[in-house]
């Protein structure tokens, strides 16, 4: 694959954000594990202690969308901004018969949460975010939770070229797409790499190229969902 042209000259050479790793426990909670990575120690312990009741109170049970993660972050007073190219549920997802039941179950809740987001102090922005903006945020503000296609994730360190047996499916999509949340925590400009934490794995920092990240986060099914965290 030919490397894309992204002007990184304005950015410092390296950035790395220390985070306490959290591994997902089930096949549906990768996004929740990512939220845990950006909480304070006290809030993290509180959430884990009341995990079942919090999930029930939030109403997502075993089906979490990015907007659900935003409500969780707001619950624990974590400042953030949510960017997506689709407000609500993409109409194209209804055409797949296999997912009709899942979407029918979630659609009303998701649309309601989008509709009430402003009232709850959740900033939702419609549109695509350039990679330079994301890297600049890592430098100035904090980590980012990114929805990716797990089948396109790579890691230079653990030689993860495609989705591994260790990587669990988090969202019920067609075979070509497996939705999976990761936490971006830094970059190396000269090597054109980003650092990220994958909640499917034990405590480790993964590394992939900027171009690989762009492919994974802009794959059909992700809506380019991105949560920029302000720590």
Regions found by a protein language model. Give the residues of each.
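Cysteine-dependent deubiquitinase/ubiquitin-like isopeptidase catalytic cores across multiple families
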Residues: 55, 59, 116-137, 154, ...
């Amino acid at each position: 694959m030919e490397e894309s042209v992204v002007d990184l000259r304005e950015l410092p050479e390296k950035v790395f954000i220390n985070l306490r790793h959290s591994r997902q426990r089930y096949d549906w909670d990768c996004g929740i594990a990512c939220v845990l990575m950006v909480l304070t120690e006290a809030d993290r312990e509180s959430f884990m202690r009341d995990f079942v009741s919090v999930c029930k109170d939030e109403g997502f049970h075993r089906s979490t969308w990015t907007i659900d993660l935003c409500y969780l972050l707001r619950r624990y007073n974590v400042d953030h901004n949510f960017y997506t190219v689709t407000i609500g549920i993409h109409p194209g997802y209804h055409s797949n018969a296999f997912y009709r039941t899942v979407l029918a179950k979630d659609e009303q809740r998701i649309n309601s949460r989008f509709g009430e987001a402003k009232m709850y102090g959740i900033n939702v922005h419609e549109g695509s975010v350039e990679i330079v903006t994301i890297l600049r945020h890592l430098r100035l503000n904090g980590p980012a939770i990114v929805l990716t296609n797990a089948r396109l994730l790579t890691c230079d360190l653990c030689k993860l070229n495609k989705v591994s047996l260790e990587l669990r499916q988090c969202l019920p999509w067609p075979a070509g797409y497996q939705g999976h949340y990761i936490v971006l925590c830094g970059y190396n400009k000269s090597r054109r790499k980003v650092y990220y934490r994958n909640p499917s794995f034990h405590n480790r920092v993964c590394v992939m190229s900027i171009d690989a990240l762009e492919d994974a986060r802009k794959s059909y099914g992700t809506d380019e969902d991105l949560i920029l965290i302000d720590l």
